[in-house]
Amino acid sequence: MSEFWLCFNCCIAEQPQPRRRRIDRSMIGEPTNFVHTAHVGSGDLFSGMNSVSSIQNQMQSKGGYGGGMPANVQMQLVDTKAG
């Protein structure tokens, strides 16, 4: 006994992908609240943790990073086991 497959393309309509809206330069505005704090290159990040720490200290010394407010947060841990 053999199997016979027949595909009817007329019955299966592929849904067209929604068109993505093209963005041009006129649709992009100027940055807001931008503060330039440091130059970081790929070599800086791969040179070790001392360099990363140095970059973090440099950025914090520029200001704008100490404005956080303390908050008490309570979270409940739920242990889920696959079974």
From Swiss-Prot:
Modified positions (Phosphoserine) in chain numbering: 42, 51
Q: Which GO terms describe its molecular function?
A: signaling adaptor activity; small GTPase binding
Please give, as recorded in its UniProt entry, the membrane topology of this protein: Lipid-anchor
Q: Where in the cell is it found?
A: Cytoplasm, Cytoskeleton; Cell membrane; Cell projection, Phagocytic cup
Q: Does the keyword Nucleotide-binding apply?
A: no
Residues spanning the signal sequence: none
Keyword Cell division part of the UniProt annotation: no
Q: Start and end of every CRIB domain? A: 28-41
InterPro entries this protein is in? CRIB_dom (IPR000095), CRIB_dom_sf (IPR036936), SPEC (IPR039056)
Q: Name one GO cellular component term.
A: plasma membrane
> Which terms does the UniProt entry file under GO BP?
phagocytosis; regulation of cell shape; regulation of Rho protein signal transduction; regulation of signal transduction
Which segments of the protein form a coiled coil according to its record?
A: none
Task: Indicate where a lipid (S-palmitoyl cysteine) is covalently linked.
Answer: 10-11
Sorted keywords for this record are: Cell membrane, Cell projection, Cell shape, Cytoplasm, Cytoskeleton, Lipoprotein, Membrane, Palmitate, Phagocytosis, Phosphoprotein
Q: Please describe the quaternary structure of this protein.
A: Interacts with CDC42 (in GTP-bound form). Interacts weakly with RAC1 and not at all with RHOA.
Similarity remark: Belongs to the CDC42SE/SPEC family.
Q: What is known of its domains?
A: The CRIB domain mediates interaction with CDC42.
Q: What does this protein do?
A: Probably involved in the organization of the actin cytoskeleton by acting downstream of CDC42, inducing actin filament assembly. Alters CDC42-induced cell shape changes. In activated T-cells, may play a role in CDC42-mediated F-actin accumulation at the immunological synapse. May play a role in early contractile events in phagocytosis in macrophages.
By what name is this protein known?
A: CDC42 small effector protein 2
Q: Which organism is it from?
A: Rattus norvegicus
